[in-house]
């Protein structure tokens, strides 16, 4: 069975128009390929902002990460409101954005108190953008009539414990993919997988 894996980088999902185009491309390809997997990055500039929020919190700045949180909320809310037409779908996506940004704020508060950011915390923080984008793109595909589900790569990719420079453990990863991703594909679902993190 042929499987197409597509990767959309930050500029390709950088705003509502770009996310809409990415959804169109994925839909077109799903007509030609039996199985399609979409891998998605954070919107352009988001990972840099997340990194800045964590680093400034560690340096004793208790405000910058809050400003970044507010900016990212406004940016992702705008994308959701422009693209998702159903009130229920829009509300659940806005709640998903809030959940991820609350996690970001909680991490940054802890970092601010401790005065340091661990590699493990940084890995979690910088993944927030792609996790939000995966949820948005999967919802847009569903709205356009395609079964789709956001998938956190931590459910699929097993790595060693060298945070910030982890190496995938391929045998364990293959097992996870066979258990979790392959059944989705067999069911005609387009998984939208986060593009940076593993477990």
Regions from the language model: what does each represent?
Residues 1-199:
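Nucleotide/pyrophosphate-binding catalytic subdomain
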């Amino acid at each position: 069975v042929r499987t197409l894996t597509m990767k959309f980088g930050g500029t390709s999902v950088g705003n509502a128009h770009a996310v809409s185009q990415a959804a169109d491309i994925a839909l077109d390809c799903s007509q030609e390929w039996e199985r399609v997997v979409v891998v998605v990055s954070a919107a352009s500039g988001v990972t840099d902002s997340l990194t800045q929020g964590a680093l400034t919190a560690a340096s004793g700045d208790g405000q910058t990460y809050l400003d970044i949180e507010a900016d990212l909320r406004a940016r992702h809310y705008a994308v959701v409101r422009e693209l998702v037409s159903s009130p229920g779908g829009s509300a659940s996506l806005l709640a998903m954005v809030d959940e991820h940004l609350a996690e970001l704020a909680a991490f940054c508060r802890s970092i601010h108190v401790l005065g340091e950011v661990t590699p493990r915390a940084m890995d979690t923080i910088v993944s927030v953008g792609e996790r939000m984008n995966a949820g948005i793109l999967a919802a847009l595909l569903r709205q356009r009539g395609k079964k789709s589900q956001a998938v956190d790569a931590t459910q699929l990719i097993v790595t060693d414990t060298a945070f910030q420079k982890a190496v995938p453990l391929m045998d364990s990863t293959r097992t996870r993919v066979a258990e979790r991703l392959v059944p989705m594909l067999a069911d005609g679902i387009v998984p939208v997988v986060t593009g940076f993190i593993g477990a």
